[in-house]
């Protein structure tokens, strides 16, 4: 059965004019299939910040380069911004809670040239991904399930921590470890996600395929891989974000593409 993904909560910290804000997407009062249908508030209340946070999620899940405009979205009183996304992922009629946390930073990018005055005038900020965390239900040594840290990329010496989860997902091969370290540094350099990168996903897929059939580790690795792939599919196929720039074009009816939908009955006439 195709996995179903729903965003259940977003927490924003030091992003645009929001020092801290949290929004639950779950409707607990009435048994509706839909949750949030609209977001209302006065000017400056953070409505656009939420849309920009969803746009950032789209870039992350699709492993696309985060535009430099997000460097300007970091609060002026902070060096970084943190956004946490909570999901419910349905796999085989079972719902698994998942949390993806993204920390953004910025650095000054200097244009080519060695003239001091020229550099000061033309310098601008470039966005960079400082850290990514992926939390889901993990199994403890006594067999119980609890929310735990699956992937944390803050370490510069290793691909990610905890080491036990790294060895479960990727294995202990030195060659793949070196390749992933290079991929991680390139992802950080180009402001792309590493958790949902093709290199890491392929490494997990390869490790899962090479594990012995019937092994508990193979089943566990396949489960975590299914969670990651469900989010990737959700970001590429199901998540659509229309920001203020796009909504303006739609309102003005100035989209470059014009199309008409005709029913089969009208075509028959």
Where are each of the predicted segments found?
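Pre-Walker A-like glycine/lysine-rich segment at the N-terminus of P-loop NTPase domains
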Residues: 1-56
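A general secondary-structure signal for short beta-strands and their flanking turns/coil
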Residues: 5, 18, 34, 78-82, ...
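Hydrophobic beta-strand residues in large extracellular and virion-surface proteins
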Residues: 10, 23, 83-85, 100-102, ...
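Short acidic, glycine-rich loop/turn motifs
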Residues: 12-14, 85-93, 136, 263-265
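Residues that cap or initiate secondary-structure elements
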Residues: 16, 29-31, 91-93, 108, ...
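Conserved P-loop NTP-binding catalytic core
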Residues: 51-112
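Electropositive, glycine-dotted interaction segments
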Residues: 105-266
């Amino acid at each position: 059965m195709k996995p179903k993904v729903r965003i259940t909560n977003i927490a924003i910290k030091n992003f645009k004019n929001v020092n801290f804000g949290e929004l639950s997407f779950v409707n607990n009062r009435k048994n509706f299939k839909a949750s949030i249908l609209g977001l209302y508030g006065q000017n400056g209340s953070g409505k656009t910040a939420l849309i920009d946070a969803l746009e950032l999620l789209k870039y992350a899940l699709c492993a696309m380069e985060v535009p430099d405009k997000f460097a300007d979205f970091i609060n002026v009183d902070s060096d970084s911004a943190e956004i946490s996304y909570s999901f419910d992922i349905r796999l085989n009629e079972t719902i698994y809670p998942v949390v993806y946390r993204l920390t953004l930073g910025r650095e000054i990018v200097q244009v080519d040239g060695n003239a001091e005055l020229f550099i000061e005038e033309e310098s601008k900020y470039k966005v960079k991904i400082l850290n990514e965390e992926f939390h889901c239900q993990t199994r403890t040594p006594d067999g119980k399930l609890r929310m735990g840290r699956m992937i944390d990329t803050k370490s510069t010496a290793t691909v990610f921590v905890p080491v036990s989860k790294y060895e479960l997902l990727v294995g202990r091969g030195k060659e793949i470890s070196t390749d992933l370290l290079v991929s991680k540094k390139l992802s950080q350099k180009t402001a792309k996600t590493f958790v949902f990168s093709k290199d890491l996903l392929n490494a997990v897929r390869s490790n899962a395929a090479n594990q012995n059939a019937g092994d508990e580790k193979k089943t566990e690795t396949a489960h975590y891989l299914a969670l990651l792939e469900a989010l990737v599919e959700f970001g590429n196929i199901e998540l659509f974000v229309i920001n203020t720039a796009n909504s303006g074009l739609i309102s003005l009816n100035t989209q470059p593409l014009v199309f008409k939908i005709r029913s089969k009955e009208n075509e028959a006439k």
